[in-house]
Amino acid sequence: VVGVLLAAAFGLSYGVQQAVAAQFHEVAFALPFLSLSLGHLVLAGTQQNPQRASHITHACWWAAPLAFVKEDMGVTAAMIGAIALIRSGWLREAANTLFPHASKDVPAFWPRLREVFSGWTKSRGAAEATLLMVWGLFWSYTSMNLILPIFNVNHQFDYADKVDLFGALKNPLNALQLLFTPDEKAQSLWLLLMVGAFLWVVSPLAAVALPTIAWRMLSSNSSYWLSTWHYSLVLMPIVFMALLDVLVRVHEHRRRVAASAHDKAAADQNTAYQKPEQQNTAGSDWAKPYRNATQAIILKTPLWLVPLLALVFTVAPILTAQPTQPLAQLTDPVFTTTDQTSTEVNKRRAVDAVPIGASVATDLSIITELIPG
C-alpha cells in the first residue's frame, strides 16, 4: 500500500506534470539514475556491512552518469557522494581514530592519519563515494568552463551570469534572503515541501536537492523561480526517495522497539519494586512528555497515512477552483477539441513559410516545429 501511494504521488506530482506538459528536456534522463542511486542509499540505511557497502557502491555507480546529463547535475552527483560517504560509516570511524578518547596508549597523530587513509582504501563504499564527489565537481566545472564554451559562438558559457555564486559566498545572509524573496520563490519552495508531506526534509537524502534549489532561487532569471516547465522534474525523485527513506527508518525503529519490548517491560517491573530511596530522584525532565508524545506518534501512526497525505497534497492543486497544474486542463473543453485558435493557425503559417535550410529566430512555442525531420 505504501509503495502504491508513493508511486501515485510521484507520478501525479507537479514536477512530473509540468515536465510532461512542456517540451522534452534532457533532464528527463536524470530520473532513472537519481531513482536507482537514491534507492540504493535508502537500502544502505537499513543494512550492515557487507550489504550496506554493496548498496553504497551501487548508489555511486548509478549516480556517476548524472554528470553527463546537464552541466549542473555533476554537483548533484557530488552531493549524492557526500551522503553516501556519511552513510558508509567511514567518517565516524575516521573521527574516532583521529580524535580518540583520552587513553594512555594513544598513537601519534601521523600514524593515526595513516590508519585513517588505510581504512579509506580498504573500506568498500567510502572510496567510491569520495571519488564520486570529485567526479561530479570535475565534470560540472569542465562542462561550464571548457566544453560548453567550445560549442558557443562567443566561446563562453551563456548562463554564467545567471547565478552570482561568488556574491552569494561573500554575503551569505543576503543569499539566504534571496532564496525566499520575492514571493514566487517562497511559493515554489512551499509547494516542494508540501508535495512530500513535509517529512521528506527529515531524511539526509533531502540534501541532494540543495544544489538545484540553490541555483534556481539565486538566479536572476525569474522563470527559474516558478514551479512550471521542467525545472522541478529532477527534484521529484529526490523528494519521494527521501520520504521513502523516512518511512523505512520509522519501520526499522518500530521493529527495534518491538524486539526490545520484553527487556523494557522487565526493566520497568524491576524499577517498580525498588524502594523509594533507591529510585532516581533527579530533577524533573521537562522534555520527557514531548519525547513520549513524539514516540507515540512514531509508533502508532500508520505508515500508509504519510504517502496518502503526500498524494492528497499532490492532487490538491489540480482540484482547486483555479487549478494551476496541467492535468486540470483535462476538464477544459478546449483540451478536447481539434479546432485551432487563430494564434495556432498563424504559427503554423509562419512555420510553413520558412524555407528548408534557413536559420530563423523563434520562441519556445514553435521551436520543435522548426527542427528538421
List the model feature ranges, each with a label:
Residues 3-31, 40, 63-64, 68, ...:
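Aromatic- and kink-enriched transmembrane "portal" helix at the membrane-lumen/periplasm boundary
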Residues 9, 28-47, 55-63, 238:
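Specific aromatic-rich, kink-prone transmembrane helix
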Residues 57-66, 71-87, 132, 208:
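Transmembrane-embedded, aromatic-rich helix segments that form part
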Residues 75, 207-256:
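Hydrophobic/aromatic-rich transmembrane helices and adjacent perimembrane loops
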Residues 76-134:
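Perimembrane helix-loop-helix junctions
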Residues 90, 121-200, 205-211, 310-320:
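Membrane-lumen/periplasm interface segments of specific transmembrane helices
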Residues 133-137, 251-270, 275-324:
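Signature aromatic-anchored transmembrane alpha helix within multi-pass, membrane-resident enzymes
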Residues 344, 350-373:
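Short periplasmic/luminal acceptor-recognition loop of GT-C membrane glycosyltransferases, typified by
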